[in-house]
Structure formats: C-alpha cells, structure tokens
C-alpha cells in the first residue's frame, strides 16, 4: 500500500492536478491507523481472554491430574488394605481351623476315654465274675469255720441288739447309697446325653462358622471383583483423560496457529482495506479530474470550433495561433490516455484486492467455524470431565460404603467368634467338670459295687457255712441218738431227773425262741420304718439335684436304646447282686428250720445221766413236733437257734468216752472258729461305718 501511495504521489507530482489529494490521503491514513490500532487492541483483548481461558483450563487439567493421582494413591491404599484384610482373614481362618482341629482332637480324646471307661467297666465286671469263682473256692475253705458260732452264743446274744441296730443303719445307708447310685447313673446318662448334645452343637456351630467363612470369602471375592472393575474404570478414565489432555494440547496448538494466521490475515486485510480505500480515493479523484478534463475538453472543443470558424474566417491571419491549439490538444489527449490507463490499472488492482478480500473472508469464516467447533469441543470436554468427576465421587462413595460394610461385617464376625470361643471355653470347662465328677462318681460306684459284691460273697459264705452246719448237726444228732441208746442200755437213769431236766430245757428253748421272734419282729419293723424314712430323705435331697441336672441346658438329646439297655442291665445286675443274698438266705434258712427237729435228741442225752425210759423217748420224739410248729417263725433266725443248741450242748455233761473226746475237740475248734469269725465281723462293721461316713461326707460336700 505504501508503495502504491508512493507511486501515486510520484505520478501526482508528475501532474499538477494530484497535489490537492495529499492532505486527504494523509487524513485517510491517520484514520486507517486509528482503526488498525483499535482493532489491534480488540484482538489483543480477545487473545488475552483466550490466554486466560487456556490458563484456567490448564489449571483445571492440573487439578484433574492431581485428583487422578490422589485417586490412584487411594486405589493403591485400598489394594493394600484389601491385601491386609485378606492376610488377616487367612490368619483367622487358619486359627479357626486349628481351633476346630483341637476341638475334634478333644472330642476324639473324650470318646476314647469314654470307650476306655466302658472297657474298664466290662473288664472289672468280668474280673468280678472271676472273683466270684475264687470266692467260691474260698467258701469251700471257710465252710469248716462256721462251727465257731456255737461256743460264743452268749456273747453274740449280748451284742446282737447292737449289731441289729448297726445292721439296720447300714441297710438304711445301703438303700440310700443304692438310690444315690441310681441317681448317679441317671446323672451319668444325662451327662452322656449332654456330651452328645455338646458334640452335636459343636458340629452345628462348626458348620455355621464354615458357612459364615464361605460367605465372607464370597463377599471378599465380590469386593475384589468390584475393586478390579473400579480400577479398570479408573484406568480407562485416566487413559481418556490423558487422551483428552493430548487432544486439548493439540487443539491449543492449533488455536495458537489459527490465532497467528488470523492475526496475519487481519493485518493483510487491514492493509488491503487501506490500499482499497486509497485506490478508491484515487479513482474518485481521477474520475473528478476526468470530469473536469472532459468539461475542459468540451470547452476546448467549443473554443476550437469557434476558433476554426474564426480561422476559416481569418484563414491566414490566424495561422500562428492554430499550431499552439494543436499542441494543447495533443497534451490534453495524452493526459486523457494516461488517465484511462491508470483507471484500468486501478480497476485491475481493485479486482485483485476484492478477490484477496473474498479469500481472506472465507479463511476468516473457516477459522471462526473452527474456533466455534473447538469451543464446542471444549464444552463437551468440560461436560465429560464433570461426568468423570461425578463418577469418581460415586466410586469413592461406593468404596467407602464397601469398606464400612466390610469393617462392620468383620466386627460382627469378630464378636460372633469371641462369643463362640467363650461358649466353647465354658463348654470345655463344663465338660471337664462333668468328666471329673463322672469319674469320681464312677469310682464311687465301683467301690460301692465291690463292697456290695463282697457283702454278697460273705453272705453266701455264711449260708454255705450254715448248710455245712446243718449236715454236721444231722451227723451229730445221729451220733448222739446212738450214744443215748448205748447209755440207756448201759446205765439206769432216774426218770424224774430226766423229765425235770428235759422240761427245763424245753421251757428255756421256748422262752428264748419267743424272745428271738419278738426281737426279729421289732428289727423288721425298725428296718421298714428306717427304709421309708431314708427314701423320703433321699427324695427330698436328690430332687433339686435332679432338677439342676435336667435344667443344665435346654438343648438335650434323648439317649439311645442301647445306652438305656446297658444302664438298665447294670442297675438290674447291681440290684440283683444286692438283693440275691437275702433270697438265698431265705431259701437256705427254710431247710435249716427242718434241721431243728433232730436237735432235741441231742439235749435229752445231755441232761440224762444213766438210763432212759420209754417216757423219755416219747418226750424226745414229741420235741420235734413242738419245734416243727415254730419252723415258719424261725426261718430268718437260724443263727439264734444254733446259739441255743450250743447252750444246751455246753450245759450237758457227756461221759468220758471216745465219742466225748471227739465232741470236746469239735467244740474247741468251733470256739476258735467263732472267735475268728467275730473278729472278722467286727472289722467288717468298722469298715462299713468308715465307708458310709466317707460317702456321706462326699455327698454333703457335693451338695
């Protein structure tokens, strides 16, 4: 533009009519400079605003990057927490498995100990049977020792009442102990049921814990899958954000390049506009000059025509002036040609500038469209960033909720596990206590069973000794009858003395038998009263214990049929072992009462001196009939009748003969045996007293 202005100025200087346009051109240039400065300030403001927007966007991108880094760190922390939780859970599962193994081992130990106890009981039962066989052999040895009861009959009568009281108390204690043993057996059965219920409950709890562990593992797997999914989404978001950042950077670079192009195009546009305006002004000035020149040409034509007419009129006179007019016309024509050529040049430049303006306007439109598209893309990116931020917030909330739920679930599991461990510890303590009490009770029952069996064996021994005494008494009665017959033939004894002695002996026997019957009735009544009182006391004592044992837990299972049968067999065996001596005694005493009939012949010869008459024989034969009437009453008092027999045998004075020496030896041996048996009975009663006191103390301590 400046070059054009310089050329125009040079051309104007070449002509005189262009000097008047310089001032206007300078004013136009000033206005153009002002316009350019104004536009420049506007464009600078816009560029500054765009730069501030870009800086804000860069800051936002930096914040987003920082947030993404924070999220990455949080995700890493979450991964570490998840790994720690997994390790803790694995450790907890290992601990639970170890505890479960310990419980299984303890249950196996309990089962083995219980089986060992059962085997020991069976072995002891078999050993007791073997002991019974050994005792039978001992009974055969001790059959001869029962004859010692004859000499010490008076001492036995004195101590009989004491022994009867002791026996009644011991029987009452025995019944109480039997009832206690039954109750203890019931308690043992209940404890077995409780052990089974504890085993079942422990198995159910183990299954419950295993199901809970499986559920926890499933939740952990689900949480891990969610965390992986969230990490994938976060990684995708990070990748998209990185791509967005790269695109934004590329777009920023393109914007900068487009801004630079716009600035260059705007500068070119300004220059073109200034050149166009200067050219339009020049064209307008050229047109004005052309119009002036045309008017001058018209005036010159008119003047030329007038002058031609005048020349024609003055042909020769005016020849000098015609040469000058033609030179002016030539100059005017040359100027007109120059103006035409300059106009053509200006029009070509105007068309060229218009084409360049159109191209610049098209490029400006394209750049503006690109800017609008970039603004829209920036808005979209902002919307996507907002969406990503919202999604990140949601993910954080979900992660926090998952952590809270996981922590609450862990706390609940820990509480449940602590509660279950406490319950298992309490159950272990209760099982240990029940084991100790059951072992103690079993030991007591074994001791009591052994004592009862020993008593039964002793009772059987006594009965066998009584049977042997029966046989010996029969043999002695036969020997005495033979001896009496020999004495009756050899010597003559006064009938009056024999009758008196015989009547006195009979009266003594009858009175003693009546006293013994009364004593037996009194002892029986006392025993019945004591048994009833002991039953009432035992019911009162053992009812609260039975309630406590039954109300030990609500969850108890019924014992099996085999256990009931086994316990019932044991109790029946125990009862039969206790009550069989009585039956055997009653069965063995019945035939002993029959032996009393031949005892009277032993008395009559003892009281007679030398001879017997038919009256004495009739009396001696009438004595068994009198004694047979009292057989039913004397079925339980064989020992007392034997004592009476010993009294009469001691009161009689046998003559010196080989039969008398045999009888004296027999009596001496029986004295020794009776003394030994009395010592054994005293020791046995003392042992029974001690054991009964111990058992009473133990039961009082348990209560």
From Swiss-Prot:
TM ranges: none
Annotated signal peptide: none
Modified residues (N-acetylmethionine): 1
Residues in coiled coil: 77-199, 242-303, 346-533
Localization of this protein: Cytoplasm, Cytoskeleton, Microtubule organizing center, Centrosome; Cytoplasm, Cytoskeleton, Microtubule organizing center, Centrosome, Centriole; Cytoplasm, Cytoskeleton, Microtubule organizing center, Centrosome, Centriolar satellite
Single GO cellular component term: spindle pole
Pfam families listed in its UniProt record: CEP63
Family per similarity comment: Belongs to the CEP63 family.
Subunit comment: Interacts with CEP152 and CDK1; these interactions recruit both ligands to centrosomes. Interacts with CDK2, CDK5RAP2, WDR62, CEP90, KIAA0753/moonraker and CCDC14. CEP63, CDK5RAP2, CEP152, WDR62 are proposed to form a stepwise assembled complex at the centrosome forming a ring near parental centrioles. Interacts with CCDC57; the interaction is required for their location to proximal end of centrioles. Interacts with FXR1; promoting its stabilization.
Job of this protein: Required for normal spindle assembly. Plays a key role in mother-centriole-dependent centriole duplication; the function seems also to involve CEP152, CDK5RAP2 and WDR62 through a stepwise assembled complex at the centrosome that recruits CDK2 required for centriole duplication. Reported to be required for centrosomal recruitment of CEP152; however, this function has been questioned. Also recruits CDK1 to centrosomes. Plays a role in DNA damage response.
Name of the protein: Centrosomal protein of 63 kDa
């Amino acid at each position: 533009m400046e070059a054009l202005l310089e050329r125009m100025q040079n051309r104007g200087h070449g002509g005189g009519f262009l000097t008047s346009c310089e001032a206007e051109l300078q004013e136009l240039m000033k206005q153009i400079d002002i316009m350019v400065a104004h536009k420049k300030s506007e464009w600078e403001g816009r560029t500054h605003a765009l730069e501030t927007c870009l800086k804000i966007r860069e800051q936002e991108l930096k914040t987003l990057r920082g947030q993404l880094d924070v999220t990455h760190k949080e995700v890493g922390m979450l991964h570490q927490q998840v790994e720690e939780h997994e390790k803790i859970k694995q450790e907890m599962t290992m601990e639970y498995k170890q505890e479960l193994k310990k419980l299984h081992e303890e249950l196996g130990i309990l089962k083995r100990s219980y089986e060992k106890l059962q085997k020991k009981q069976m072995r002891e039962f078999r050993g007791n049977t073997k002991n019974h066989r050994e005792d039978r052999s001992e009974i055969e040895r001790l059959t001869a020792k029962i004859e010692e009861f004859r000499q010490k009959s008076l001492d036995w009568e004195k101590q009989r009442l004491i022994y009867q009281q002791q026996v009644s108390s011991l029987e009452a204690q025995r019944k109480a102990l039997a009832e206690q043993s039954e109750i203890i057996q019931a308690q043992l059965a209940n404890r077995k049921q409780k052990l089974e219920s504890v085993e079942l409950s422990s198995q159910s709890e183990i299954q419950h814990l295993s199901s809970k562990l499986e559920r926890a593992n499933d939740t952990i797997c689900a949480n891990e899958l969610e965390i992986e999914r969230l990490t994938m989404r976060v990684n995708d978001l990070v990748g998209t954000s990185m791509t967005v950042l790269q695109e934004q950077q590329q777009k920023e670079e393109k914007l900068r390049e487009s801004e630079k192009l716009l600035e260059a195009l705007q500068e070119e546009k300004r220059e073109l506009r200034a050149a166009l305006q200067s050219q339009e002004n020049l064209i307008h000035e050229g047109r004005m000059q052309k119009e002036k020149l045309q008017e001058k040409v018209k005036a010159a034509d008119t003047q030329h025509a007038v002058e031609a007419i005048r020349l024609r009129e003055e042909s020769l006179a005016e020849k000098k002036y015609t040469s000058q007019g033609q030179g002016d016309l030539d100059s005017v024509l040359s100027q007109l040609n120059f103006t035409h050529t300059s106009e053509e040049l200006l029009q070509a430049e105007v068309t060229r500038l218009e084409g360049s303006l159109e191209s610049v306007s098209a490029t400006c439109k394209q750049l503006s469209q690109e800017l609008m598209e970039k603004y829209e893309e920036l808005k979209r990116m902002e919307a996507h960033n907002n969406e990503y931020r919202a999604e990140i917030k949601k993910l954080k909330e979900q992660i926090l909720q998952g952590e809270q739920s996981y922590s609450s679930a862990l706390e609940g599991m820990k509480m449940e596990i602590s509660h279950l461990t406490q319950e298992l510890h309490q159950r272990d303590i209760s099982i240990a206590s029940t084991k100790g009490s059951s072992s103690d009770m079993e030991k007591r029952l074994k001791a009591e069973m052994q004592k009862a069996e020993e008593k039964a064996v002793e009772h059987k021994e006594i009965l066998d000794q009584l049977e042997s005494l029966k046989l010996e008494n029969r043999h002695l009665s036969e020997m005495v009858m033979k001896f009496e017959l020999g004495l009756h033939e050899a010597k003559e004894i006064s009938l009056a003395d024999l009758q008196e002695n015989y009547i006195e002996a009979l009266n003594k026997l009858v009175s003693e038998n009546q006293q013994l019957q009364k004593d037996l009735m009194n002892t029986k009544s006392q025993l019945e009263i004591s048994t009833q009182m002991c039953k009432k006391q035992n019911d009162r004592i053992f009812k609260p214990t039975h309630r406590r044992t039954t109300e030990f837990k609500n969850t108890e299972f019924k014992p099996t049929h085999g256990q009931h049968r086994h316990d019932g067999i044991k109790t029946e065996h125990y009862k039969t072992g206790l009550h069989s001596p009585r039956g055997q005694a009653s069965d063995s005493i019945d035939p002993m009462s029959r032996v009393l009939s031949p005892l009277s012949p032993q008395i009559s010869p003892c009281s007679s001196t030398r001879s017997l008459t038919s009256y004495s024989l009739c009396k001696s034969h009438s004595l068994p009939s009198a004694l047979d009437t009292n057989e039913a009453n004397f079925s339980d008092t064989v020992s007392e009748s034997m004592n009476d027999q010993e009294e009469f045998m001691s009161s009689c004075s046998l003559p010196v003969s080989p039969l008398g020496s045999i009888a004296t030896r027999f009596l001496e041996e029986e004295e020794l045996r009776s003394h030994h048996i009395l010592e054994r009975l005293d020791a046995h009663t003392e042992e029974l007293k001690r054991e009964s006191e111990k058992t009473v103390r133990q039961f009082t301590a348990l209560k």
